[in-house]
C-alpha cells in the first residue's frame, strides 16, 4: 500500500468515525452530572434537587448506576470506531448499539413531545408532578434530553457506519 493510499484511507476512516466520537462525548457528558448528583452536588439537576432521593437505593441506581451505564455507553461508542473494537463481534455490537440508539432517541423525542403537549394545553401534569414541572430547574431537562437525542442519533450513525463498512474493509480497521 502506498503512502497516498494510507493517507486517503486514514482520512476516510476519520470521516466515518466522527459520529462515534460525538456519541462517546455525549455519553460522558451525560455520565458526569450523575456522579456529582450522587455526591450531593445539585448543579444542573433537572428539578428540585432537595426533594430528590438521597441515600437510598433509588439514588444509587439513578445516579451511580446510570453514570456507570453512560460510561459503558461511551466505551461501546468508541468500540464502534476504534481499532480495539474490531475484537468484538461486529453484528452483535451493531445490533445492540442500534437497539440502544432507537430507544434513546425515542425516549428523548418523547420528552420533547410531552413538553409541547404540556405547553399547548393538550395534557395536564398529574398533581404529583405539577410542582416538579413548574420548578425553574426543570428547564435543564431540555438540555439533558437534547443530549440524550444527540447521543442516540450519533450512536445509531456510528453503528450503521460500522455495520455497512464490513469486517474486511480497511478504512475503519486502521
Task: Show where each model-derived region lies.
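C-terminal TM-helix exit segments that contain a strictly Trp-centered aromatic cap at the helix terminus
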Residues: 29-41, 102-121
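Hydrophobic cores of alpha-helical transmembrane segments in multi-pass inner/ER membrane proteins
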Residues: 66-76, 143-158
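Transmembrane alpha-helix entry/boundary detector in multi-pass membrane proteins
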Residues: 48-70
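Short, membrane-exposed interhelical loops at transmembrane-helix boundaries
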Residues: 48-52, 122-140
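Loop-to-transmembrane helix junctions at the membrane interface
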Residues: 79-102, 106
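Cytosolic juxtamembrane helix at the C-terminal end of the final transmembrane segment
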Residues: 81-86, 153-174
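Alpha-helical transmembrane segments and their helix-start/interface "positive-inside/aromatic belt" motifs
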Residues: 2, 10-27, 91-101
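Individual transmembrane alpha-helices with interfacial aromatic-anchor signatures
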Residues: 95-96, 130-151
Amino acid at each position: 500500500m502506498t503512502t497516498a493510499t494510507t493517507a486517503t484511507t486514514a482520512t476516510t476512516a476519520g470521516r466515518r468515525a466522527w459520529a462515534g466520537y460525538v456519541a462517546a462525548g455525549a455519553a460522558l457528558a451525560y455520565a458526569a452530572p450523575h456522579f456529582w448528583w450522587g455526591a450531593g452536588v445539585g448543579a444542573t439537576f433537572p428539578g428540585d434537587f432537595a426533594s430528590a432521593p438521597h441515600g437510598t437505593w433509588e439514588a444509587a441506581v439513578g445516579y451511580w448506576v446510570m453514570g456507570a451505564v453512560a460510561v459503558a455507553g461511551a466505551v461501546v461508542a468508541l468500540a464502534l470506531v476504534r481499532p480495539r473494537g474490531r475484537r468484538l463481534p461486529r453484528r452483535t455490537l451493531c445490533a445492540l448499539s442500534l437497539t440502544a440508539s432507537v430507544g434513546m432517541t425515542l425516549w428523548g423525542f418523547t420528552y420533547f413531545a410531552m413538553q409541547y403537549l404540556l405547553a399547548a394545553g393538550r395534557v395536564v401534569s398529574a398533581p404529583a408532578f405539577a410542582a416538579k414541572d413548574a420548578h425553574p430547574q426543570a428547564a435543564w431537562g431540555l438540555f439533558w434530553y437534547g443530549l440524550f437525542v444527540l447521543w442516540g442519533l450519533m450512536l445509531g450513525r456510528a453503528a450503521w457506519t460500522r455495520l455497512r463498512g464490513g469486517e474486511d474493509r480497511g478504512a475503519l480497521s486502521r
